[in-house]
Swiss-Prot record:
CDD domains from the UniProt entry: NMNAT
Molecular-function GO terms, alphabetical: ATP binding; nicotinate-nucleotide adenylyltransferase activity
Gene Ontology biological process terms in this record: NAD biosynthetic process
Upper classification of the organism: Bacteria, Pseudomonadati, Gemmatimonadota, Gemmatimonadia, Gemmatimonadales
Family to which the UniProt record says this protein belongs: Belongs to the NadD family.
Function, as annotated: Catalyzes the reversible adenylation of nicotinate mononucleotide (NaMN) to nicotinic acid adenine dinucleotide (NaAD).
Name of the protein in its database record: Probable nicotinate-nucleotide adenylyltransferase
Residue stretches spanning the membrane: none
Length: 211
């Protein structure tokens, strides 16, 4: 069984996340892809929308998408979200699965700061997501820690010019987010009043800066 893991703050989840997940599911020939919202990311700033709101939005975003499941493992565990702990929990559920961990290219430089990164990378195949216009073929060598390196697959996904930061800013400024998020997510944001008073300059939380 080929199982993918796609984690992040998803604050909020948007169409780009949805397209990337679908591209990964197809291109990597995954049997299943887990979307894993973080409870609290160690490498992110303090301001983050509450976990129950983000989980509800992620479920709305991916509802009905075949092959994709929202897994609340990190939110249910609480505290700081260390990916190595999440992977171990997933392995206990699917001991025979081949695990593929999806991360954004912008996250690669943070790998040396991830908690117990060597053990993490021994349990998964790392897949680096890129939105380059021209797909890069072949493996990518990443300096994971000190002088060591890991070989990762590079997956070129559809280019989507949007970010969670931009969406939060648009909501705060009273502008439309139609086309940025699925309708169900837009409805949730409107009904709960999320992001209307979100602080300016908040760090982008959209893609997998884990630890």
């Amino acid at each position: 069984m080929r199982l993918g893991l796609f984690g992040g703050s998803f604050d909020p989840p948007h169409v780009g996340h949805l397209l990337v997940a679908q591209d990964a599911l197809e291109a990597l020939r995954l049997d299943h892809l887990l979307i894993i919202p973080a409870a609290q990311q160690p490498l992110k700033g303090a301001h983050q929308t509450s976990a129950h709101h983000r989980l509800a939005m992620v479920r709305a975003c991916f509802e009905g998408v075949q092959g994709i499941e929202v897994d609340p493992v990190e939110i249910e565990r609480g505290g700081l979200s260390f990916m190595v702990d999440t992977v171990e929990a997933v392995r206990r559920r699917w001991p025979d699965a081949h695990l593929h961990l999806l991360v954004g290219r912008d996250v690669v430089p943070t790998l040396p700061r991830w908690h117990d990164v060597d053990r993490l990378l021994s349990m998964v195949r790392l897949v680096v997501l890129t939105r380059d216009a021209a797909p890069q073929e072949g493996p990518l060598l990443i300096d994971a820690e000190s002088d060591s390196g890991v070989v990762a697959e590079v997956l070129s996904t559809r280019q989507v010019d949007m970010s969670s930061t931009e969406i939060r800013s648009r909501v705060r400024d009273g502008r439309s987010i139609r086309g940025f998020v699925p309708d169900a997510v837009a409805t949730y944001i409107a009904s709960t009043g999320l992001y209307r008073e979100y602080p300016r300059g908040s760090a982008d939380t959209e893609r997998s800066e884990r630890a």
